[in-house]
Design a protein with these regions (language model features):
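A short, active-site helix/loop in glycosyltransferases that binds the activated sugar's phosphate group
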Residues: 99-101, 140-167
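Nucleotide-activated donor-binding/catalytic signature segment of Leloir-type glycosyltransferases, i.e.
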Residues: 240-256
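Short His-centered aromatic/hydrophobic patch
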Residues: 91-97, 115
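Conserved acidic donor-binding segment of nucleotide-sugar-dependent glycosyltransferases
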Residues: 308-319, 328-334
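Aromatic "clamp/platform" in nucleotide-sugar-dependent glycosyltransferases that forms part
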Residues: 257, 276
């Protein structure tokens, strides 16, 4: 039986966290003894961790003090919280988990670092390192870096050096289509007019403020519609204030976090991704699985999400181009129907089992 340690920053409602839970449920407990190290012990997914997974957390929550401790004393934290030897260690998200596990110097342990975001667009991991050189060194301590899209791999190589990606792997996030379709029937969502849905953490990268600006423009155009934004995050209050101050409550509804967002997606006429920066957008793939037309801004991983445009419509990453694309759905019925056909074509791509097997093969060390 192999001993495997996974590390992740939190168990908040992000795509990486959902993928990790899927992976933990997939791995055979008869083959693997699994330990999960959560750097900041916060998040909604703790109750969904399989019982056979042993869980440890370092800090109760995110804080400036905790960030400083990781930046200054990662090796000490490693020694304190990783007291056993493991066959495999996986830092499943860039940032603190990657920094801490890089301190392992056991030559018998294979170490993997997962990359879910384009750090070249927003270098949000820098706060955990004393210098850029220290971050490069941390990545160099891993046997392999695994990227969730080819676009992220390319951006990482440009930022940190091509030598770090020469032994890299690209592994797309797995999604269980049958479960998503079943959960999409769990409850009813009102649908009495043209409905647009957007799903994601309410953070600057997701572009929900500019989507709200587009909503206001469409109201001024006299269009009748509903925009449902499903998610929560640090920019939620600012988004709520913008909706209220611009008197958009009749059209734009902030749903907040939903453990099961799929009925909102399924009952939409259009799914919109307004992101400024992405890694591999799970919600887009979920919309495609449900056969919902998709319009997305062009950012890291989106072309791979949408089969280079075969399964959805990709626009230049500007507010104006996104507005015009959404407007076409009102003005050109044939355009929306074409998007529907694209999404349905993408929905039959069943890649769940194959992607999970590839991740397991990487953990087993059989994928070069």
């Amino acid at each position: 039986m192999k001993k495997v340690l996974f590390a992740i920053n939190t168990l908040n409602n992000g795509g990486a966290e959902k993928v990790l839970l899927t992976l933990l449920r997939y791995l055979d407990p008869k083959k693997y003894e699994i330990h999960l190290l959560v750097v900041f012990g916060e998040g909604i997914y703790f109750e969904q961790i399989p019982q056979y997974v042993r869980v440890t957390h370092i800090f109760p929550c995110k804080s400036k003090e905790a960030t400083k401790e990781i930046r200054e004393h990662a090796a000490k934290l490693y020694e304190q919280y990783v007291k056993e030897s493991y066959d495999v260690m996986v830092a499943f998200l860039e940032g603190p988990s990657t920094k801490i596990l890089s301190c392992c110097n056991d030559p018998m342990c294979r170490k993997y670092a997962w990359m879910h975001t384009n750090l070249k667009k927003r270098h949000r991991t820098a706060v955990f390192y004393k210098s850029f050189e220290e971050e490069i060194y941390a990545y160099s301590q891993y046997d392999k870096i695994v990227f969730v899209s080819e676009a992220i791999r390319v951006a990482f190589g440009e930022m940190f050096g091509i030598e770090l990606v020469q032994n890299a792997a690209v592994c797309y996030n797995p999604l269980e289509a049958k479960t998503i379709r079943r959960m999409a029937e769990a409850y009813k969502v009102a649908h009495d007019k043209f409905t647009i849905c957007a799903v994601g953490r309410v953070i600057p990268e997701k572009g929900f403020l500019r989507l709200t600006s587009i909503c206001e423009h469409m109201v001024e155009d006299g269009r009748d519609f509903t925009l449902n934004i499903v998610g929560d995050g640090k920019e939620y209050d600012r988004l709520k204030e913008m909706v209220e101050s611009h008197h958009l409550e009749k059209w734009e509804h902030l749903i907040g976090f939903q453990e099961n967002p799929y009925p909102y997606i399924k009952n939409a006429d259009l799914f919109v991704c307004s992101s400024l920066n992405e890694g591999y957008n799970l919600a887009i793939s979920e919309a495609v699985i449900l056969g919902v037309p998709v319009i997305s801004t062009d950012c890291s991983g989106i072309k791979e999400n949408l089969g280079n445009g075969k399964w959805g419509y990709i626009v230049e990453n500007r507010k104006e181009t996104l507005y015009h694309a959404i407007s076409r759905c009102f003005d050109e019925p044939g355009f929306l129907e074409e998007l529907k056909k694209k999404s349905v074509a993408g929905s039959i791509q069943d890649t769940y089992e194959g992607r999970l097997k590839k991740i397991e093969s990487i953990i087993e060390g059989v994928v070069n």
